[in-house]
Amino acid sequence: MARPIILSNGEMHVGINRSGLVHDFYYPYVGGENHAEAHNLQHRVGVWVDDRFSWLSSDDWEVTFSYVPETLIGVVTAVQHDLGIMLEMTDAVDAEQAAFLRNIHVVNLAENARDIRLFMHQNFIISNSYASDTVQYLPDEHVLVHYKGPRSFVIGGSTSDAKTFDQYTAGLNGIEGFEGSYRDAEDGELSNHAVEHGRVDSVVRFSLSLAAHDSSRVYYWIAAGKSHREALRIHHKILDDGPLHRLLATATHWRQWLSRAQPTAAALPERYRDGFLRSVLLVKAHIDKRGAVIASTDTTMLNYSRDTYAYCWPRDAAFALWPLIRLGYTDEALSFFGFCRRVLSGHGYLMHKYTPDGALGSSWHPYRQRDGYEAPPIQEDETAIVVFLFAHYYTLHRDDKLLREFYPTMIEPMANFLASYVDEEGLPRPTYDLWERLFLTSTYTTAITYAALTEAARLAEAYGDQAASVRWQTAAEAMQGVAQHVLFDTERQALVKGVRRDPDATVVDTTIDASSAYGAYMFGLYAADSHEVAQSFATIDRVLKTSDYHPGLARFENDEYNRFDPTRVGNPWYITVLWRAQYHLECGQADRATALIDWVNGQMTTTGMLAEQFDPDTLQSISVLPLTWSQAEYVSCLLDLLHSEKRT
């Protein structure tokens, strides 16, 4: 499960699969409508030469991946030795408009001159629905257009000598006995069928004549719009500017955007710099321009599971934005705060997760528990961490205009909810834990809620709302006092997973959970050097260890999610390893921290990506790749490393 290349501009987002083919195509929201969201919806690339044909998806091709340094421009190199062909595809989503660009360098590796035909296949499921798509050839424009309703995709291209595609076809795909129009390409010729509707695909052909060891280029693009007119306008812009110019402009855009992170990267040890900058870019790639931050756009798992990660969890978003704020980026956080304010419930809390347009995402959390207890199906930590993040942003920028705008409309209702949604002793009432599994008052949620109320009190004071400041600070202190009496298990020498107060008793869940120790010190519920936190991490090292040969740590005991071996504690996650490194840094143990960071650094893919979790034996990536949170936690850990060096 992987997308070794992802490309984005905050409106269009494209995922390239392990065969070098387009396999996720989001527009007009990052993480929203995926017009290529199915196992068989990859956009194929094929080559015909010497009366032989091969698709890149076959095992005969050797495919490698990289990025152009300091950009979100991907490079796919595909070699077929038997055919004597190499394709070098430089891919980008145009930084300024909704267009996917491929600069395809076609190389003849043979000792003789040859005619080579390159076939580009389009296979959309527009707006996530197979019904009622249309593909047409537009003779006046010499393009193909796939469309349905307010979505149009114009297919254009040219060779390096300014010739466009010389054949095309439109056909049915996976319906009425038709496999797809891509089959029409396999004899090297296309039928020029000009229209089809229903479940459709299309192919265009570019013809090249290359001398021995010669090469040429094919420029290919998909321009998207909410109408034919808009998509054609972008198509004409590419023609007028030239596709190479659009690629160069996109490279310039990303290098300018990344310049804010460059001084920090330069201060890091050299072995971390590429991974640091790549992770910053990968976080940015998952941010929709209207504020949502998507957990992952890799939809490979949709073919095996019920859903994808293409949602905005406020928690994941906050962890993704935290290092960007520390680096001095502002636009992304401000857009996210606006997103949160728009989706905030009338009761002052955020829901489980959202689609990038602000609609409620799918959920498995009920309003009524099995014992009849009724409560909103939320994770309270997701509301709390937004307050915490906003306060962090305000502390850095002291933007009083921003505070005046967001205090009454977001901070005050959120903090009022956090302060009031407590039990008779002052602890947060039960909600779902950050892992989305258990309904209880978790240590992690208590910690971030305490921190949020403390920060909200400071924001209230800055705003001039003294009564709210006192009220929220009082609630925070009461919460901390109770927590420090009930959340540590002296028998297991660890902070507990959480508590659930039933009518007759308080039930304590003593499961060892990495988030309990991390949250307790990171958000100030306990001092980092306290006995409770130190012993908790020692217990975590012992209980959640997944191997004697690497430092991988599971999230919690008996974590069944994607676990292959039921005798193991669970799969290790990258964020838990990085949390451990951050605590070492907090304790002044830089050598132990860098050993963990070095190990994570070595597990990155060739394109700098980290998955959600990995196999404890083979170290192969499991679940989505990349996971935005994993990339962000890597950046945060390196920022902590620099901070720790400044303290010493």
Name these PLM-found stretches.
Residues 1-46, 309, 320, 351, ...:
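C-terminal capping/lid segments that line or modulate ligand- or cofactor-binding pockets
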Residues 1-81, 154-183, 249-275:
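An extended acidic
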Residues 1-9, 181, 228-230, 243-312, ...:
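Low-complexity, Ser/Thr/Pro/Gly-enriched N-terminal "stalk/linker" regions
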Residues 65, 114, 208-229:
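Short Pro-Gly-centered flexible turn/kink motifs
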Residues 65-70, 75-77, 292-302, 311-312, ...:
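Helix-terminus loop motifs that line ligand-binding clefts
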Residues 77-79, 83-187, 202-204, 237-260:
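Polysaccharide-binding surfaces and accessory modules of carbohydrate-active proteins
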Residues 155-177, 345-368, 442-447, 469-575:
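Extended ligand-binding clefts on enzyme/binding-domain cores
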Residues 167-173, 178, 266-292, 337-362, ...:
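Active-site acid/base region of carbohydrate-active enzymes
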